[in-house]
Design a protein with these regions (language model features):
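Beta-lactam-recognizing serine transpeptidase/beta-lactamase-like catalytic domain environment
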Residues: 1-53, 58-188
Length: 188
């Protein structure tokens, strides 16, 4: 996971590849700490991003778990939803048509995901985001881990719920997302 090509995993505290001995001796502790943090920087740990469609199976699992949907439910994708007064389009603006739950995942259908989110409602949706540890650190032994940014109950409304269901308008790290799938795949 080293994203710094000059990084030597066997000597992570060595700054001699970037600074002379004289420069190192003249550095304050804060300057050395800043230089090490820059060297140890890893975008998979420190940068957050919108997980997008990779989040959809987590929403479906949560909705099934709480009983908001069933495996035999069907959905109609007509290319988008009007949420309050906001039109939010599916990636397929012409619509996927009638879909089973399996089709929703296979087609990566934003329209159906919004319908699922509305059945979950805001408070339970946020609860499941937290149960899956979004908004928290993984505990990886690397510095500067980001938590990502989530809505809370006061700031999430129907439009934010709708866009969150297909992995937009909140953030996570590239280290956080695989953990949700690994624990289930390891059981197979």
């Amino acid at each position: 996971m080293a994203s710094n090509h000059g990084f030597d995993l066997t000597d992570p505290d060595d700054l001699s590849d970037k600074y002379t001995d004289a420069e190192l001796k003249s550095m304050t502790e804060e300057e050395k700490s800043d230089a090490l943090n820059e060297k140890w920087y890893n975008y998979c740990v420190s940068e957050s991003f919108e997980p997008g469609s990779t989040f959809k199976p987590i929403v479906v699992a949560s909705a099934l778990e709480m009983g908001a949907i069933t495996t035999d439910a069907t959905y109609v994708c007509d290319g988008g939803e009007f949420v309050t007064d906001t039109e939010i389009k599916c990636d397929n603006i012409y619509g996927h048509g009638d879909e089973t739950l399996s089709d929703v995942i296979k087609n990566s259908c934003n329209d159906a995901m919004m319908q699922i989110g509305m059945k979950m409602q805001i408070t339970p949706f946020l609860k499941y985001q937290r149960l899956f540890n979004f908004g928290s650190r993984t505990g990886i032994d690397l510095p500067n881990e980001s938590t990502g940014v989530l809505y809370d109950r006061d700031s999430m409304h129907e439009v934010e719920l709708a866009t969150n269901t297909f992995g937009q308008t909140f953030t996570s790290t590239k280290c956080r997302l695989p953990l949700h799938y690994m624990r289930h795949l390891m059981q197979w």
